[in-house]
């Protein structure tokens, strides 16, 4: 069990790093959004275009990263949605059993299906052709837009981190069940 707990701790450490990156993305999203708003209105007033599609797309890329990088962090800290009016009154062992069953049956299934469904579109976005070779990657349809492949790849990272954190939570729940 000690080896599994060390493995769980390593996953938790990585999750903390991704959680901090998610928080940083929030700050960048706000800063870029603020710039986009000011530049748009100032540009209208002066008759000069100060914004670009790149900055607008970067803003929604960062907004997406906030959630994709933060999913595992939310699970680790127990901020995920629950039926709290029941859950709060239960003993730690009962909570651990409910989480163990829920994570094992539903969250792992959700992550595996998510990884399976998104892998092919991500590879296509990187330019993978039907014959297995690679061509040009997917670009924004807007002029001066950003490539789509990097942000689509982060979907896989988000699901992967959520799956790894789920395993970590299962290990910790088993420990709670064994101790009580």
Name these PLM-found stretches.
Residues 1-180:
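Alpha-helical transmembrane segments and membrane-interface helix-loop junctions
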């Amino acid at each position: 069990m000690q080896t599994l707990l060390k493995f769980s701790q390593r996953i938790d450490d990585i999750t903390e790093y991704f959680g901090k990156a998610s928080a940083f993305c929030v700050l960048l999203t706000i800063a870029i959004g603020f710039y986009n708003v000011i530049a748009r209105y100032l540009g209208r007033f002066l008759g000069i275009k100060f914004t670009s599609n790149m900055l607008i797309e970067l803003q929604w890329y960062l907004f997406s990263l906030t959630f994709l990088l933060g999913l595992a962090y939310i699970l680790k800290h127990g901020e995920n949605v629950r039926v709290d009016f029941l859950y709060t009154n239960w003993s730690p062992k009962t909570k651990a059993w409910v989480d163990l069953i829920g994570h094992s049956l539903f969250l792992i299934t959700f992550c595996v299906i998510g990884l399976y469904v998104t892998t092919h579109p991500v590879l296509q976005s990187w330019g993978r052709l039907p014959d297995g070779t690679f061509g040009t990657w997917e670009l924004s349809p807007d002029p001066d837009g950003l490539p789509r492949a990097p942000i689509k790849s982060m979907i896989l990272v988000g699901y992967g981190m959520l799956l790894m954190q789920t395993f970590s939570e299962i290990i910790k729940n088993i420990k709670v069940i064994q101790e009580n």
